Amino acid sequence: MPYGDDVPAEDMGYVHGINLVDELDEVEGFAGAGEPCAAASLASEPQPGQSAMPAWAQRVTAAGETGMLSPASVSPVPVPSAPALSADASIPSRRAPVVCAVSGSGGCGKSTIVATMAHAASLLGLRAAVLDLDLMFGNLYDLLGVDAPHDMATLIEPSAAGALAEPDIVTASMRVAPGVTLWGPVAAPEKAELMARPVELLLDVLRRESDVVFVDTSVFWGDAVAAAVAASDRCLVVGDAAVSSATSASRVIELASRVGVPRTRMSAVFNRFGARGADEDVAMRFEIACALSSKIRIADGGQDLAALMAFGRADEAVGQTSAFATSVREATREMLVELGCAVGPWSDMVADRATRTERPRIRLPWSREGDPR
């Protein structure tokens, strides 16, 4: 599948459904993205006397084998005083929330949930940025209908300078639909281990430029995944009716706690509810094993959902009147409201499909039984 140079140039100037160069100057836009990123990177560089270990790794080390952070083990880190901002500074005070989908076993459907939730957010009038951090073998671009994926590894070289410029970010982006833009994975899986710093810089920019950031993760956590999970405002622990789903989910929750995510920011997401073998009892066992106060159930989409996702039609999947689409829309709206997003009414597509009658069927050229042919 082609990467980078094979993609038409007209798709390269759009992120979140708008033109970056023309329409993001009134906010802290990409035109000056180098300066804020450079300042943020300087603040995060290890100072003399400080450890060069990432913040999430410091928390894991402090937690030790118990997984608990004692108050005495975390010493306050002195924060240098920030320079006074001028009166005309236009830096937004609010940063977009980050929603990470994690799981302890593959095949539970978290990529489908991320893809459909991103489209649901766009139907609510939000600009959704999507990161596929299954860097080696992720296929979120397939589920979102991208024909020619861009290589996220192009961010490795510019990130060495401590900042990402607008052309670098746009080149690695894929405009999926108005309000939905995707980054990732990498074309060469062996470059995945080099993506920690680029992902941190990209995530910092996207939190300023978008309304919500959705992150799909891999079962194996590298530095990039751990940093994204540590920065998340909501961690979706996804599982299904598989035998090992509940056990692996509880282990993921423990790891997320050790990298700094409190359990109050986690939600137990039981996927494919209502399918064969995924009844109320199985869902309750999963939720009890997770022991989280926030619970979400996503209804089974069946073969109809599988057919749509196989052709990259996640937008149609979330716009239907099926039980799956309804559960995704309701869960997404409730979560975004809790995270403080300014959600609007559902777009006309959802309203039209909600009132639309059943699709007319083709009348075949023969009569009913008993009628003359």
Feature map (PLM): residue ranges:
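Well-ordered beta-strand positions
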Residues: 212, 234, 292-296
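Acidic-aromatic/histidine active-site loop/patch
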Residues: 1-99, 160-163, 255-258, 264-266, ...
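Cytosolic-facing regulatory segments adjacent to core modules
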Residues: 161-220
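Beta-strand-loop-alpha "switch" segments that mediate conformational coupling across diverse proteins
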Residues: 272-274, 286-316
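Walker A/P-loop phosphate-binding motif and the immediately C-terminal alpha-helix
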Residues: 93-144, 206
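Arginine/glycine-rich "motif VI" loop of SF2 helicases in the C-terminal RecA-like domain
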Residues: 122, 256-264, 287-292
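Inter-motif core of Ras-like GTPase G domains
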Residues: 222-242
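Phosphate-binding loop that captures ATP/GTP phosphates
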Residues: 121-181
